Amino acid sequence: RNFPPMHPWCRCHYGVAVADWDEWQDDYYRKHSKLTDDEEAAVKRYISSDSYLINEKLRRQIDLSDDEKKFVADLDSALRKIPHYKGKLSRSLRFLYPEDVESFIKDYFVGNTVTYPEFLSTTFGSTYNPDGQVQIYIVGSKLGCDISKYNNKEKEVLYARDNKFKVLRHSKKNGVHNIYLWEEK
């Protein structure tokens, strides 16, 4: 509380040191910011079936309409403010055709890094779709945003665009691919 003694005419200075400024700033911003109406609307819109359309366009790098660009910008902004979830997450994928499964899993070999250009929906609840041919598990999650407040039924955790994950393990049992991922910052 008290300042340490100083010598007259001394050029010493006093300041606050922050080890990781970016992390501190992100944490401060998240704690002291509420979602705007547009940001909250974007989260709710994502939870609806709009997530499928926007993610498909982002995944395939298809041009977005002006409305979709605003939607993505508002959702990006919202995810910077929403608290992160820490723990285990899962994601279930069901494909119509076996060749689609094979096409999807070709990049999921141990040690490889995969990048998702789209928003990535996961759950901290039980397996979302036990009939999915691909079950993805994210261990030690720290970067996913907990949107369960808006989608409690699915216990959804949403990753921002362009997140990278390292493949830790990939096994196939009873026709189901089990893939374990680790977040890369």
What are these regions (language model features)?
Residues R11, D26-K185:
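Mono-ADP-ribosyltransferase
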